[in-house]
Amino acid sequence: MMETKEKVVYPRYAVIRLRGIPTTPRDIATTLHLLRLRRKFTMVVVPGTPSIIGMIQKVNDWVTWGEIDADTLAEVLKKRGRIVGDKPLTLEYLQKWGWQSFEEVALAYITGEIDSLSCRKVRVREGQRPPCIPYLKPFFRLHPPRGGLNSVKLHFSVGGDLGYRGPLINDLIRRML
């Protein structure tokens, strides 16, 4: 009898780059580039796999991160989602690919129904929807936060803004939309 592997659902983390490019060490710059955090105030949403967590911990002094919830992710997709060609992500575009709303996509990603938010070419059979949003850019450009930041030199645990902040990342994201 063959054993079926159970799919592991990792938590989803929002990672926001808060510090700029000058004087960034090469290994940190490479890791930020691999995470697609190439500019200040850019956000990516990633699964919490051990390799991704290791990368985030390496760039901990340049980013802030925490668990994103479905409501915040739906708002980000609605207001800041872009598709290739720098066009906004619209409800009509989602419906063309079989999704009914931004909330449905966000919930499917957070619960692990889909593995990735963005992908390139997708072949979908009729009556099925793709396992992602085709041609969605894998990062989100945000505004600087309303009300400003406390300090980009101190960690969140000591009154700054860098490092792990848990579910409080959702408040920061809403201030940056």
From Swiss-Prot:
Q: Does the keyword Transmembrane apply?
A: no
What does the UniProt keyword field contain? Answer: Ribonucleoprotein, Ribosomal protein
Does this UniProt record's set of keywords contain Cytoplasm? no
Q: Which Pfam families match?
A: Ribosomal_L30
Q: Which GO terms describe its molecular function?
A: RNA binding; structural constituent of ribosome
GO annotation, cellular component aspect: cytosolic large ribosomal subunit
**What Gene3D superfamilies has UniProt attached to this entry?**
1.10.15.30, Ribosomal protein L30, ferredoxin-like fold domain (3.30.1390.20)
An example GO BP is: maturation of LSU-rRNA from tricistronic rRNA transcript (SSU-rRNA, 5.8S rRNA, LSU-rRNA)
The family annotation for this protein states: Belongs to the universal ribosomal protein uL30 family.
Quaternary assembly = Part of the 50S ribosomal subunit.
In terms of PANTHER family, this protein maps to: 60S RIBOSOMAL PROTEIN L7 (PTHR11524), LARGE RIBOSOMAL SUBUNIT PROTEIN UL30 (PTHR11524:SF16)
Q: What is this protein called?
A: Large ribosomal subunit protein uL30
Source organism of the structure: Pyrobaculum islandicum (strain DSM 4184 / JCM 9189 / GEO3)
For this protein's source organism, the top of the classification is: Archaea, Thermoproteota, Thermoprotei, Thermoproteales, Thermoproteaceae
Gene field: rpl30
